[in-house]
Amino acid sequence: MAVTRTFSIIKPDATRRNLTGAVTKMLEDAGLRVVASKRIHMTREQAEGFYAVHKERPFFGELVEFMISGPVVVQVLEGEDAVKRNRDVMGATNPADAAEGTIRKTFAESIEANSVHGSDSDENAATEIAYFFKPEEIVG
């Protein structure tokens, strides 16, 4: 397997409960390395742009409101098959369906407040990383 990068967001429900360290530890324990990280409070424009793919979906407005409701931690993760590895440790979107030991099973409050976002493909990872990070901010 090749070493690749993926993008992760620790969402407001998790940062509000001071879970940034616990979530990051689970990611690192899964073999992912944090090569860039910053805590930000997304603007409405940032959230709408980031989630533009969902603009026509009925949950778009609620998603944007949730993502701007508090600080988030955006991260670039690196490791072998990083997208898949990150998605495996995150667990299913719906925490009720997530496997034991995953981030969402352990920390998510609901399907909406599910603690983390992770890229779903290498292509989307590259786009999402570039949305929040300049190349010089990523230190491998």
From Swiss-Prot:
InterPro entries: NDK-like_dom, NDK-like_dom_sf, Nucleoside_diP_kinase. PROSITE patterns: NDPK_LIKE. Its EC number is 2.7.4.6. It catalyses: a 2'-deoxyribonucleoside 5'-diphosphate + ATP = a 2'-deoxyribonucleoside 5'-triphosphate + ADP; a ribonucleoside 5'-diphosphate + ATP = a ribonucleoside 5'-triphosphate + ADP. SMART domains: NDK (SM00562). It comes from the Bacteria. GO terms for molecular function: ATP binding; metal ion binding; nucleoside diphosphate kinase activity. ATP binds at K11, F59, R87, T93, R104, N114. Keywords: ATP-binding, Cytoplasm, Kinase, Magnesium, Metal-binding, Nucleotide metabolism, Nucleotide-binding, Phosphoprotein, Transferase. One of its GO terms (biological process) is UTP biosynthetic process. Its cofactor is Mg(2+). Coiled coil: none annotated. It is found in: Cytoplasm. Pfam families: NDK. One of its GO terms (cellular component) is cytoplasm. The keyword Magnesium applies. The keyword Nucleotide-binding applies. The active site is at H117. Belongs to the NDK family. Homotetramer. PANTHER family: NUCLEOSIDE DIPHOSPHATE KINASE (PTHR46161), NUCLEOSIDE DIPHOSPHATE KINASE DDB_G0292928-RELATED (PTHR46161:SF3). Major role in the synthesis of nucleoside triphosphates other than ATP. The ATP gamma phosphate is transferred to the NDP beta phosphate via a ping-pong mechanism, using a phosphorylated active-site intermediate. This is Nucleoside diphosphate kinase. It comes from Sphingopyxis alaskensis (strain DSM 13593 / LMG 18877 / RB2256) (Sphingomonas alaskensis). The lineage of its organism: Bacteria, Pseudomonadati, Pseudomonadota, Alphaproteobacteria, Sphingomonadales.
